[in-house]
């Protein structure tokens, strides 16, 4: 069967352009999810001039998305509409609510499964399109989580500089407190920052680390109790959590079964050896491995797998591929 990958446009264009209009739709559906869920019925929407959703008939040619109580957001645009791929990609994250939250992980890796060289050089494994994609995920999510290694290596700002959208709460995991407070994420005022470490390492009365709030959670020997952390973030109103990296951090969330979706951007690059993308305890047989349902999108020269970790391919009957692979190579 001849198959195609959907191209997700990323260039910042004018307000009337397909990609920009599609992103305005994505932001609007993310804002409207809680209200749509409370209605508990199917409702179709279009994008109004104020960039907010307006209810509309399902069969109206201007209908763009619809809320389905059993599924969340679905896109109503025809398959050949150049806005559809971008909207489709983000709808599972936009469907999150306080009752049904979502945690999504992301890694950009080489063809042979590495996120950096052995020295830690990682800028950039994937192309600029994937960088914009990460900024989009930040804009959609209430919190972005990174490990100490990512902060030490990349000194990221973790803001939404490249796209319209609000900055998320920045969460830095540093179990053993090896970071200094001179990194940008602890010094700028781009957004609130939570500096998370083992509770026993928090000094009595200590509240700030640079400009960040110090937050202690239970230690687990070689890390942090991530279930406790997720519970604390949910209590702060974080329905959408984005685990941006690096490989160790995403792997620990994956091993703890705390990721609902995983975005893997694979670049046409061979590193040979270096820092691995994902490392989990070794399985005995392939039958023990998780083969999730997935969709495939193209971003410039990279290929993005959007994996639904709460579903498996063998959960779906044979011949039902359209439900599991929206963009097929």
Range-by-range predicted roles:
Residues 1-329:
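Enzymes that bind and transform nitrogen-containing heteroaromatic metabolites
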């Amino acid at each position: 069967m001849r198959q195609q990958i959907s191209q997700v446009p990323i260039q910042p264009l004018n307000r009337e352009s397909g990609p920009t209009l599609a992103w305005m739709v994505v932001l609007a559906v993310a804002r409207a999810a809680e209200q749509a869920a409370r209605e508990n019925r199917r409702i179709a929407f279009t994008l109004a001039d104020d960039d907010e959703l307006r209810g509309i008939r399902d069969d109206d040619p201007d209908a763009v998305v619809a809320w389905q109580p059993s599924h969340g957001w679905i896109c109503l645009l025809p398959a050949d509409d150049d806005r559809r791929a971008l909207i489709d990609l983000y709808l599972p994250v936009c469907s999150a609510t306080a009752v049904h939250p979502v945690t999504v992980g992301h890694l950009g890796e080489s063809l042979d499964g590495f996120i950096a060289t052995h020295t830690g050089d990682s800028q950039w494994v994937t192309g600029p399109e994937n960088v914009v994609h990460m900024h989009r995920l930040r804009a959609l999510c209430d919190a972005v989580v990174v490990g100490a290694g990512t902060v030490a290596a990349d000194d990221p700002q973790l803001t939404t500089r490249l796209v319209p959208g609000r900055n998320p709460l920045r969460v830095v995991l540093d179990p053993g407190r090896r970071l200094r407070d001179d990194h940008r994420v602890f010094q700028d005022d781009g957004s609130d920052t939570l500096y998370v470490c083992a509770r026993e390492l928090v000094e009595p009365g200590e509240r700030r680390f640079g400009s960040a709030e110090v937050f202690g959670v239970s230690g687990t020997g070689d890390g942090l109790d991530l279930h406790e952390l997720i519970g604390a973030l949910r209590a702060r109103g974080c329905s959408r959590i984005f685990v941006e990296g690096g490989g160790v951090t995403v792997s620990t969330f994956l091993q703890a079964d705390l990721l609902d979706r995983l975005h893997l951007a694979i670049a046409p690059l061979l590193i040979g050896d270096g820092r691995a993308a994902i490392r989990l305890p070794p399985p005995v047989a392939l039958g023990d491995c998780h083969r999730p349902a997935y969709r495939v999108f193209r971003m410039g020269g990279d290929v993005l797998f959007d994996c639904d970790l709460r579903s498996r391919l063998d959960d779906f009957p044979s011949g039902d591929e359209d439900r599991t692979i929206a963009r097929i190579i």
